[in-house]
Amino acid sequence: MKRIILILVVLIVGIEFSNAQQLPQFTQYMYNTIAVNPAYAGSRDALSIVALNRNQWAGFDGGPETQTLSIHSPLRNEKLGLGLSLINDKAGFENFTYAYVDFSYTIQASADVEVSFGLKGGMTYYKLAEELYNYTEVNQDAYFDERLNRWNANFGAGILVHSDKWYVGLSIPKIINHDMNNSTDYAALETVHYYALGGYVFDLSKSLKLKLSFRVKYTKGAPISNDFTANLLYNEKVWLGGSYRINGKQRAIGAIVDFQVSDQFRVGYTYEIPTGEIRPYTSGSHEILLMYEFKFMKAKQKSPRYF
C-alpha cells in the first residue's frame, strides 16, 4: 500500500506525461517546428535562433514547465541544413532534458515547391528531482536505493514539403522506445511519437493575411493531441490569433499575439485556458517565444517566411 501511495505522489501532477507523453506540449509550434521535425533545419534561409518558455497550468503545484532552444541554418550548399535542438521539460518530480542535432537535405520539386528530408540524433537525460529524496517514505523504500537518473540515445526522421504559402510535414522525432527505470512497478517510458503538421497563408488584402495551421500528435497509450490555430497578420508586423487544442478529454483555448519588432527580431506570447477538470486549479498557461535571425543569406530569401 505504501508503494502505491508513493508512486501516486510522484506521478499525480504529471501522469499524462509519465507513461506516453514525454515530448512536451507548446502552442507556437509553427515557429519551433525543428523541435519535432528535423527536416525544418535551414528552411528559413537564415541562421535562426528560437527560444521558448512555457509555464503550463500556472498556480498548479508541479505543473509542467518547458524551455526550448533551437539553432539552425542552411549551409553553403543550399540543399543542406544543420541545427541543434535543446529541450528541458519538467512535470512533477520528473525532468527530461533533450539534446539533439538536426540535419536536412532539400530538393526542388518544382518552381515553387521544395521537399526536405531530415534526420535527428542525440541524447535524452531522465532525472527524478532531488527533493523527492527528502521524503522519509522514499528513503525507506528499497525501490529508490538506486537513483533512477540516466542517459539514453535516440534518433528520429522527418519530411517537410513547402512553398511560400503552405507547408505540410510528417515526422517521428524519437524512433527507439526506452523504459527509463527498467521496472515493471514504475514505468517512465520514452515512446515513439508521430507528428503531422501543416498550414496555409491566405492573402486577404495588401496589408492583411490569414494563416491557418494544425498539428497532430500521436503516441501509443495516450489520446491523440490535435492543435488548430488561426492568425491574422497585419502589415507584415503584427500577428493576432487564437488556438484550440483537443487532447482526449482535455481542451484548451488560447490567444496569440506576435510582434515582428525588426527584420531580425520577433517576440510572441500565448495565453491558454484549459476547459477540463483542472480549470479550477489554475489561472491558465503562459508561453513566450523569442526569435532572432542573422540574415546574412538575405539575398537568397525568396519571400517572407510565415512558418
What feature does the model see in each segment?
Residues 1-4, 109-111:
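Positively charged n-region of N-terminal signal peptides that target proteins for export
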Residues 4-14:
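Sec-dependent N-terminal signal peptides
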